[in-house]
Amino acid sequence: MDTYEELSLEASKFIQDLTLYEASKDGLFRVDKGASNNPEFEETKRIFAAKMAKIHLQNQQKNIPDTGTSEGNGSNLQYTYSMPKSVEEVPVTYNGQSSSSVGQSDYKTYRESYKVKPEIDSADSSEEPVIRHEHETMLLSPVSKVGHAIPSQQFTCKKAISPSNESLERERIGSENMHSDLNLSSMINCKPMEKNTPHNKCSPLISSSVIFGEETNTHIPQQKFFNLSSPSSINLQKTSDHVCLSETKAAKEFNGEQRGFCSTNSLNSGSSNDVKLSALSSYCVGYNENSSDQIKQMQAPCYTFNSGHSSADEQPQEIPFSCTDSSAEPPASTLDSDHIDIVQDSSTLMKIKLPCQTLSQSSKQGSSRAEKKLEAITRHLEQEMDAHTRADYFGTCVKCSKGVYGANQACQAMGNLYHNGCFICSACSRKLRGKAFYFVNGKVYCEEDFLYSGFHQSADRCFVCGHWIMDMILQALGKSFHPGCFRCAVCNECLDGVPFTVDMENKIYCVKDYHKILAPKCAACSLPILPSEGTDETIRVVSMDKDYHIDCYRCESCALELNNEDDHRCYPLEGHLFCHNCHLKYLENHNLS
């Protein structure tokens, strides 16, 4: 508890103002933006990290079980993996013996850096070997450059997790390995090296997981998988005849718009005391339709590791694979034994093409649907036009007795309604709307046909001048006029298209002159009673058969305005207008006299 209290006090120094802190890349600390150059802060951070690492190692050592053995008549095989104190040193022990340390700059080859020495009894046994794991293990992954031979291997340490939640980890590893394998760009070339087993071939692994299991000549029995972290994982399994190291890789199915293919190689059975590493991997290669021209192909052969003897009929297997991403280097990890040779057989490498799934073009829909839609729209427009034209109904044509719809189809002449196509010249069938026409004996003629056909002898005469109307005719009051002859009798203004009036003597007047001449005159002021300005209505007062302006209708004695009110009523006497009081006075004076 004292340790944790001390750590909590030191940690509280970092969290004084949360707004000034941001998460660091390693996820262990929170760094003050303003204190990046503070030496005291850096020293405190280093001490805090060292104490956390120390407590972590102490908890790990408490959980490490002692190395045990499996007693019995069968094989005695022990495997112990321990967490190194630093990344520079990766010890792996088998039966108490540790492999040579892996340095940071110069790394030894497979044979020198990683040795597997299992102790297997020759006698048959039914008991299972003791397989021991620690909470965390380290995996050696060779780091190589693409396109160069690998005379000596460089290794990086990758942290693994405990073999719990097997199914969930297998799915997570599969998704991570799938994305890591898509970063391969070109082949890893391996120079052939001839040693004890010249027929064996090896190449750097793409992703690996080690399986220690028992194997017979015909099949592989039950296997216990211990899935580890990405992209490689170590799986252990018991064996009775020999130990087989195989490489597995979990893959998940693609979904969405990507497509892929999987190539899987099975594990071949071998003789006893053999250690094999074969690629049991299913590479899921994503294929993007938009970048199909950027696909590059690459192959990697299968690799087999033999610890001692191998049968003559065993042949290495090769797994060609392809990758779509040509910008990333392939991650690799390799396990080795005493007699591992790295060779390459370029003659057996074959390039394969990615299976492209052609997208079936959906057949274009026939034009029948578009035509039907167009017909429906056309019918709708026709219905709207019909509804609009029916609203502009003018009447019935006197010639064809059919309805006239729309102002552009109506023509009115001589007080009758015609269609434009019905009001035509009787001789040449020319449309006469807006043109001069002649009506002779119930027929209509255009001007040319009337002048040169002799029909003018029977044409109408002008009511004013008495001459034949040879051009346009103006009809009013049942009579025919020349347009120039139809004028006001007072001001002589042409009344063609202007309102006019006629008196009892059939004299034509404009409205203004009619009111001046024919309007009634006021009995009081002797002026004509005209309509108000801007209107055609005339307002007057009639009393004793006389006409008066409204303002002139007053008492002649006191000039009181007379109207229908009680005190303003008119009391005429002897042709004079009087109010009630003046009327009484006039009667009294008349009686006295």
From Swiss-Prot:
Tagged with keyword Zinc: yes
GO cellular component: cytoplasm; nucleus
Localization in the cell: Cytoplasm; Nucleus
Keywords: Cytoplasm, LIM domain, Metal-binding, Nucleus, Repeat, Repressor, Transcription, Transcription regulation, Zinc
An example molecular function term from Gene Ontology annotations: metal ion binding
Disordered: annotated span: 308-336
Gene3D superfamilies given in the database record: Cysteine Rich Protein
Pfam hit, one: LIM
Principal localisation: cytoplasm
Single biological process term from Gene Ontology: neural crest cell development
Domain LIM zinc-binding residues, every copy: 395-456, 460-520, 521-589
Assembly, per entry: Interacts with snai1.
Family the UniProt entry places it in: Belongs to the zyxin/ajuba family.
Role description: Acts as a transcriptional corepressor for snai1 and snai2/slug and plays a role in regulating neural crest development.
Name the record gives this protein: LIM domain-containing protein 1
Protein's gene: limd1
